[in-house]
Amino acid sequence: VSKAYRGGRQALQKVDFHLRKKEMIFLSGHSGAGKSTLLKLICAMERPSDGKIHFNGHDITQIANKDIPFLRRNIGIVFQDHRLLMDRSVFENVALPMRIESASENDIRHRVSAALDKLGLLDKAKCLPSQLSGGEQQRVGIARAVVNRPALVLADEPTGNLDPELSNRTMQIFEEFNRAGVSIIIATHDINLINSRPQHRRFELNQGFMSEVEGYGQ
């Protein structure tokens, strides 16, 4: 798949890879290498200039705009800047994807509470995001991404603003969800973090081109 922006800047050039079912991989590269662009293409936030992306047997590059919400039911997204609603409680932020789906209040209460409990945030359910630390806000973003039990989670620099201890704990959380059957792509420039988990395959983007890095995923 390729992606060019106005002015001719080539963000991605003939990127070709396969994410196995229930696999967790790292996507590395310097700032501006195309990591965020690739994640946006996978969840149909942007369209490729050329090529196809297949997810669950469907070519999502051909998906109609009206069908994108159905696609995103199966894809959870963790943003680098959290993108929390600052005037809503932690509970309501996590519940948002379920409310968009018109889930029942009983399901919302049960699944949001379970997600917050899993991430150690149940006691923060009534707090506003501004009352939380950066690490806690990041975990709220993760809870929101997984509350719909997606098949795939895309995480864009999820440890970018965290200290090493919190970064490690965040990765442990992703690995727990991965063991539960969720496929995960983590975009990060933190090589130390990647090297601490060599069991996961690593792909690197450089000037829009992707290659698999040897020595990972053994």
Where would I find each of the regions flagged by the language model?
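Conserved ABC transporter NBD signature motif
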Residues: 51-59
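Catalytic Walker B motif of ABC-type/P-loop ATPase nucleotide-binding domains
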Residues: 153-156
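Short coil-to-helix segment of the ABC ATPase nucleotide-binding domain corresponding to the Q-loop/switch region
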Residues: 88-95
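ABC ATPase NBD coupling module
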Residues: 6, 60-76, 179
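Conserved ABC ATPase signature
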Residues: 128-132, 136-138
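Helix-to-loop junction immediately C-terminal to a conserved catalytic motif
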Residues: 43
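A short, proline-enriched helix->beta-strand linker immediately N-terminal to the Walker B motif
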Residues: 147-151
